[in-house]
Amino acid sequence: MIDSTAVIHPTSIVEDGAVIGAGVQIGPFCVIGANVSIGEGTTLKSHIVVNGHTRIGKDNTVYQFASIGEANQDLKYAGEPTRVEIGDRNRIRESVTIHRGTVQSDGVTRVGDDNLLMVNAHVAHDCVVGNHCILANNATLAGHVIVDDYAIIGGMTAVHQFCTIGAHVMVGGCSGVAQDVPPYVIAQGNHATPFGINLIGLQRRGFSKEALHAIRAAYKLLYRSGKTLDEVKPEIADIAQAHPEVQPFYDFFARSTRGLIR
């Protein structure tokens, strides 16, 4: 179904069965598959392929040569009807690739709201990208990676499969991330190691001085005290009890499956 207010360039192909919402603009030489849904106000510039069981929300802008919903690169994939789900108000720049999920997970690759995926960024099968995230040019997420809200992944950075990048993390460019990065941390290098907390980013997002002091104290316990994780957990839990901003930092320990960067 194509809404009457949608504008589709005559050189583009929209297969029967696709759902195109109100005010959608599809530029020249795009291909939209039969199982695709595109929400109102979304713009596809030109030369874009949206394939598979893919849902794109409202008011997104997708730039030329992006590929969304194509078959993933997992060798076990056998053509199962897995999906891509993208939220609202995302900017997906030139040559970005977002692949559909696998049945080995829940079958869905997810991108939330208000994200910026810069040129050549890659979101592999079963990844979950939260809200307000930035993937800079050529940032690459392997399969099953989780990127929490407000995280920034620098250009030319690769994140190993099954890693989790915590909220408000900043990963510097040209890094290789092979373990989980706790919330609020700056990580850099190959393999990535911690370089303090993302102070500027947290200030911009309205964290109070008291909260920043508490987050810094938790960071120092984890990374500078010389103690083991089991030894510092009770101390960080005490800080989190008094300062709720530290709770995501503490909770991340239980979420981690690949171990924390060190």
Curated annotation (Swiss-Prot):
Coiled-coil annotated residue ranges, if any: none
Single GO cellular component term: cytoplasm
Subcellular location: Cytoplasm
Pathway linked to the protein: Glycolipid biosynthesis; lipid IV(A) biosynthesis; lipid IV(A) from (3R)-3-hydroxytetradecanoyl-[acyl-carrier-protein] and UDP-N-acetyl-alpha-D-glucosamine: step 1/6
Keyword NAD in annotation: no
E.C. numbers: 2.3.1.129
Function: Involved in the biosynthesis of lipid A, a phosphorylated glycolipid that anchors the lipopolysaccharide to the outer membrane of the cell.
The protein's name in its UniProt record: Acyl-[acyl-carrier-protein]--UDP-N-acetylglucosamine O-acyltransferase
Biological classification of the source: Bacteria, Pseudomonadati, Pseudomonadota, Gammaproteobacteria, Enterobacterales
